[in-house]
Amino acid sequence: MAQQTPLYEQHTLCGARMVDFHGWMMPLHYGSQLDEHHAVRTDAGMFDVSHMTIVDLHGSRTREFLRYLLANDVAKLTKTGKALYSGMLNASGGVIDDLIVYYFTEDFFRLVVNSATREKDLSWITQHAEPYAIDITVRDDLSLIAVQGPNAQEKAATLFTDQQRHAVEGMKPFFGVQAGDLFIATTGYTGEAGYEIAMPNEKAADFWRALVEAGVKPCGLGARDTLRLEAGMNLYGQEMDEGISPLAANMGWTIAWEPADRDFIGREALEMQREKGHEQLVGLVMTEKGVLRNELPVRFTDAQGNQQEGIITSGTFSPTLGYSIALARVPAGIGETAIVQIRNREMPVKVTKPVFVRNGKAVA
């Protein structure tokens, strides 16, 4: 039986089409995925992301533990509330999950991990935390609402107390602050400004309704996927998994190689991959009619004249741009163009950086 978030009833009242998403009943859309997508790019939309798992870590050796557990280095986190994106890797350098970590005090850090990987994440974290005497608290008492778009922060702030408004004033991206009963973070999964707001479960329904009244549009998983793909943001299980290295998933920037003496899980395997060469994640753009879909083959001829083949990891029609875009994992050496096989047709595509839209504007 699929689980329900504390906002399930609100979704049905808003006319959502509900689907089972990794064991959670979640809204796919509320009538028009397209309208929801455009609302986030031009105004303000909101997503129930309460299916994601918030994990609080307490203990005097928490920073030391996370420096070993994660490929990125929490030594960078020195300001209270600062957040960092990282892969959590296995010994062979594959991605167990991608997550966000927040620093509050030397003995208190917070992780936000994906719903699809919850059980294996918690098992992995618990197993490796043991020698560090870390107290692990899964915050199932909290709901999480993402409010995203150019007007999202302004509209969300109408629900805040004076203290909360003051706490978030001038807050830069990738920070979080506990203000009253809300944890407000300047993070998101859309390529737009906004907040991800955690609150006690019993407050979530009222908060959702108040956001609707403030003119924030409820958005489902469909729009969430087209928005994150336009923004070039990875989806676990598609761009990366336990068999795929962060180096092959455009996550190289999340690996902190320095200091060279920091030992983290997967480091040795990544160093070997870096030496030998690895696949890469690129963007594809197709302005001709048709849609680039997941798992379609991507073919190109490298500089040595050899035929090479990769695969589309995520593809869709981009509502913002008006043509098809995709992320693809390909062998190194791809040029500016490639061919994608769509049914019996060979379609030319332009190869770009793996990001297409930022703050409502085309970058591809």
Curated annotation (Swiss-Prot):
Chemical reaction(s) catalysed: N(6)-[(R)-S(8)-aminomethyldihydrolipoyl]-L-lysyl-[protein] + (6S)-5,6,7,8-tetrahydrofolate = N(6)-[(R)-dihydrolipoyl]-L-lysyl-[protein] + (6R)-5,10-methylene-5,6,7,8-tetrahydrofolate + NH4(+)
Record carries keyword Zinc: no
Gene Ontology molecular function: any one: transaminase activity
InterPro entries reported for this sequence: GCS_T, GCS_T_bac, GCST_C, GCV_T_N, GcvT/YgfZ/DmdA, GcvT/YgfZ_C, TrmE/GcvT_dom1
Domain of life of the organism encoding this protein: Bacteria
SUPFAM superfamilies in the record: Aminomethyltransferase beta-barrel domain, Folate-binding domain
GO biological process: glycine decarboxylation via glycine cleavage system
Gene Ontology cellular-component annotations: cytosol; glycine cleavage complex
UniProt KW keywords: Aminotransferase, Transferase
EC annotation from Swiss-Prot or TrEMBL: 2.1.2.10
NCBIfam families for this protein: gcvT (TIGR00528), PRK00389.1 (NF001567)
Protein family according to the UniProt entry: Belongs to the GcvT family.
Function: The glycine cleavage system catalyzes the degradation of glycine.
Assembly behavior: The glycine cleavage system is composed of four proteins: P, T, L and H.
Protein name: Aminomethyltransferase
Species of provenance: Salmonella typhimurium (strain LT2 / SGSC1412 / ATCC 700720)
Gene: gcvT
